[in-house]
């Protein structure tokens, strides 16, 4: 019946005697006891883990693909390119447009089809060459860059 009377303490451990100070450490050495002094956790400059950031990264697991140009930009480039006529009366080709703005013909084809990643330098060159707005608000894309003066 005496087992019922003892309180159960969870996490209680017997304290071991420790040697911490210099004088008691020297006395233990004179007595011939085994001494080991270690610095626990030395060299760890890492702080606690940021669990909020780790959880956010776990939720957002897939990398996002780069954004593409809108179809409005591609249509505006194609219509403005077709409107420009050369000396023979034919419309400008993608290759001719690419050479005039110092770009690859494939870049122009990707831009017109809507597969290209927006390149601000290329869009700026195309805006100046075609005289059509390609950046900015959606309702302004395709409008003349500099309207004709009256």
UniProtKB/Swiss-Prot annotation:
Transcriptional coactivator that stimulates GCN4-dependent transcriptional activity by bridging the DNA-binding region of GCN4 and TBP (SPT15), thereby recruiting TBP to GCN4-bound promoters. Involved in induction of the ribosome quality control (RQC) pathway; a pathway that degrades nascent peptide chains during problematic translation. Required to prevent stalled ribosomes from frameshifting. One of its GO terms (molecular function) is DNA binding. Residues 84-137 form the HTH cro/C1-type domain. Keywords: Activator, DNA-binding, Transcription, Transcription regulation. It holds the Pfam family HTH_3. CDD domains: HTH_XRE (cd00093). InterPro entries: Cro/C1-type_HTH (IPR001387), Lambda_DNA-bd_dom_sf (IPR010982), MBF1_N (IPR013729). It comes from the Eukaryota. This is Multiprotein-bridging factor 1. Residues 48-70 have a biased composition (Basic and acidic residues). The keyword DNA-binding applies. Residues 94-113 bind DNA. Belongs to the MBF1 family. Residues 36-71 are annotated as: Disordered. One of its GO terms (cellular component) is nucleus.
């Amino acid at each position: 019946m005496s087992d019922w009377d003892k309180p159960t303490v969870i996490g209680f451990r017997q304290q071991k005697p420790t040697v911490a100070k210099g004088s008691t450490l020297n006395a233990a050495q004179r007595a011939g006891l085994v001494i080991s002094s270690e610095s626990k956790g030395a060299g760890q400059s890492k702080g606690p883990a940021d669990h909020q950031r780790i959880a956010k990264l776990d939720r957002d697991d897939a990398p996002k693909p780069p954004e593409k140009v809108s179809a409005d930009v591609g249509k505006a480039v194609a219509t403005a390119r077709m409107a420009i006529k050369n000396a023979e009366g034919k419309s400008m080709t993608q290759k001719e447009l690419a050479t005039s703005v110092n770009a690859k013909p494939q870049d122009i084809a990707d831009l017109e089809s809507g597969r290209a990643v927006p390149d601000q330098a290329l869009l700026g060159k195309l805006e100046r060459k075609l005289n059509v707005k390609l950046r900015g608000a959606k309702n302004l894309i395709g409008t003349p860059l500099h309207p004709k003066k009256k």
